[in-house]
Amino acid sequence: MKKNLLSLSILTLSVMGLVGCNSNNKNNSSTVEAPKYTITLSGSGENREITLQLAERFKATSEAYSGLTFDYREIGEDKVDSAVADWTTGPDVYSYASDKIIPLFAKGAMSEVPEDYLPQIEAMGPGAVGAAKFAGKTLAYPYDGGNGYFLYYNKNLLKAEDVSSIEGLLAKATTLGMKVAYELETAFYSMGLLFTFGADWQFTTNSQGAVTNITADFNSDKGIKAGKALVNIMTNPAWQNSLGAPTGKDSTVGEGESAVKTKIVACVDGTWNAAQYKQAMGDAYACTKLPTVTVDGETKNLSSFLGYKLFGVNPQTSSGDATRLSICHALANYLVGKDAQDARFDARTIVPTNREVLALDKVQKMEHIAAIGEQAQYAHAQGALPDTTWTAPTNLSAAVKNGEMTVENVGTYMANFNTAITTLK
């Protein structure tokens, strides 16, 4: 891959040098043009305009790119793995959701990120790095870190110290006669919690990208502590399995026979409900990262799932053309750079993965974006997932709800959970 970058550097120097020579020698009719390529990008319809604008800005950064033209296909990030039937005629640079990395890798649609571009990705933090990696390789460029959750709370009823730990939050809610809404019976939330003390999974793949083995350590002390945290929260009287704006006022959650009247003072939820919650709460609206939890004397910040959107580079359209592939990587790298993420935030208020952009006043003023950015350092990337990701945690939560799983027998349940997670379908 370094050779690809070198060839592009040589190409750039050659073009610039010839342009300079020709400007000083008007009688020289010999010219060398920059290579002409049509680079096809893909992503959502909403991102078409800003992506093409940024591509044109990239083109203007070097004479070596002056021969480029850009095309855009509207292919949803959640569908690109199945919507593209033939990757030899697919998009060159495409946007995708982080949980699509396994099928895209298996189809040979992912070119490894060149070493020179790794520092920019690594500076984004462990969540973004994790989302971009599979099979021991960094395969993509993260640009949107917004598909995750954090804590909304009523700042007229709770102080910052009340929401710093889950134990303190539940105790304060009990004092107020209110509830903390945390949908732990749903795997998206319970699975996120189970990473809190460091338990995780690892994949082994074959040369075709198929998963051949999954190992995990949720049956270790790290997993057992997470299991105890799940039990401690779900058995607390102030905990409630729901979502809802924490207005502190009477409200109804659920539907039909499962509907209950309640007063919610804090809620774990995602960016997608920020506008609704802010409208419902008015000046009581506040949000922050998830609180800490303490088990057996060890304190950790509650973990979460965080889904990303990334740019992948398709090697099949370059067909061995190293210069074209290098240009595609350079474009993808530019699209996740500081200036591009700043412009994308202005255009679409997309949650930046670049830490400098995330720290800007205009970004931090949007509290839900600041909160998810703060939580990102404690989040597990929703990237490559075991087949049982959405069933095994649900079964675990059900065992707690039914009174079957307790802090005394949590080791047995976490051993069974570990077996379920590592079982290939």
Question: Over which residues does each language-model region extend?
Answer:
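A structural signal for short loop-to-beta-strand junctions that line the ligand-binding cleft
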Residues: 85, 89-92, 120-153, 179, ...
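Extracytoplasmic/periplasmic solute-binding protein
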Residues: 139-143, 149, 170-222
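Glycine-centered hinge/linker elements that transmit conformational signals in sensory
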Residues: 209-245
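Conserved N-terminal structural module of periplasmic/extracytoplasmic solute-binding proteins
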Residues: 4-9, 15-100, 419-425
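Hinge/lid segment of periplasmic solute-binding proteins
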Residues: 98-149, 161, 167, 286-288
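Conserved C-terminal helix/tail region of periplasmic/extracytoplasmic solute-binding proteins
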Residues: 355-358, 370-425
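Short helix-initiation/N-cap motifs at beta->coil->alpha
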Residues: 73-82, 240-258, 272
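Extracytoplasmic/periplasmic substrate-recognition and gating elements
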Residues: 136, 279-347
